[in-house]
Amino acid sequence: MSTTKPTQQFAFDRRRFLTRSAQAATFMGLAHTAPAWARGADLHNGAIRAGFDEVSGRDIAMTIGEGPRVVQGRRGHAIAVNGSVPGPLVRLKEGQPVRLAVTNTLDEDSSIHWHGLLLPFQYDGVPGVSFPGIKSGETFVYDIPALRQSGTYWWHSHSGLQEQAGHYGPIVVEPAGADPVQADRDYVLLLSDFTPLHPHTIMDKLKKGEGYFNYQQNTWTDDYPLSGEDRRMWARMRMMATDILDVTGSTYTYLANGRGPEEGLEYLFNPGERVRLRVINGSAMTFFNVRIPGVKFWVVGADGQNVRPVEVEEFQIGT
């Protein structure tokens, strides 16, 4: 991930950097003025936007759609909510009810699951388990009573492979009382992955051959070939020695707030400010190791829950 170097009057304050988490922990970052993509500007000439807007209040409208998506010049198909990937940041308030009207404009069923939120079962958003799903052309209203929690979470589709196509976004539930984590700036960083291949194509290839996307397989001409004993061991396990992940960076482009590594992120901040960054892993199957070279920070929350602050140089966030 590339970053734009801040001007000289901006600098990291190592001892005051905060973190908080969603499906994980939180770490880096800081925007004095949000760049165009973070504000939802259309940089892709009519294609789905990168970055997300924010929705809040007692009545929230969300629309599920689809269209072309371009990441670092690679074009693919995307399912987006309110026209962007990730979809909008849903900002809620502990103790307050909310009505979320979700309209499905796809040609297939869809859904939204509110990951980590404690809700009546009929609003959990898992088709075939807690509700029938949202049919094409229909609107489903999640009429959620007063929320009983605060913290960082995320929402995503529970229909087919729509999540990998871009159907996901962040949730922040503000506490009813004073927030135990005080910060001058508070931002969301949603990590995910992108491929121009359709998710069903990836699934089809993996079902036909689990090593289809493994482009680093051992050969007899390797400088350090496996011994016969090692080869027999891997054969007994029915595994390849280089099978770290079913799909790796050879196929995926890894994203931060919908932007690829070459597209850049810029976070500006003022000296001495306390910054909280809420990190969410919205990827299909990727684990991220997060660090800021030369900077220590504090993990102050995990899975939406406040935790005793832990100073770290790096953390791993799963999906």
PLM-predicted stretches and their roles:
Residues 60-61, 67-74, 82, 105-131, ...:
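Extracytoplasmic copper-binding redox domains, predominantly the cupredoxin/blue-copper superfamily
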Residues 66, 75-77, 191-270:
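Mobile cap/lid helix-loop segments that border enzyme active or cofactor-binding sites
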Residues 1-16, 23:
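N-terminal secretory signal peptides
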Residues 122-135, 233-319:
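Histidine- and aromatic-rich segments of cupredoxin/plastocyanin-like copper-binding domains
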Residues 102-106, 280-282:
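Asparagine-centered strand-capping/turn motif at beta-strand->loop junctions
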Residues 62, 100, 112, 157, ...:
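Divalent metal-coordination and catalytic microenvironments
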Residues 10, 32-68:
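C-terminal segment of N-terminal export signals and the immediately downstream linker at the start
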Residues 18, 107-108, 119, 128-184, ...:
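Extracellular/periplasmic metallocenter environments
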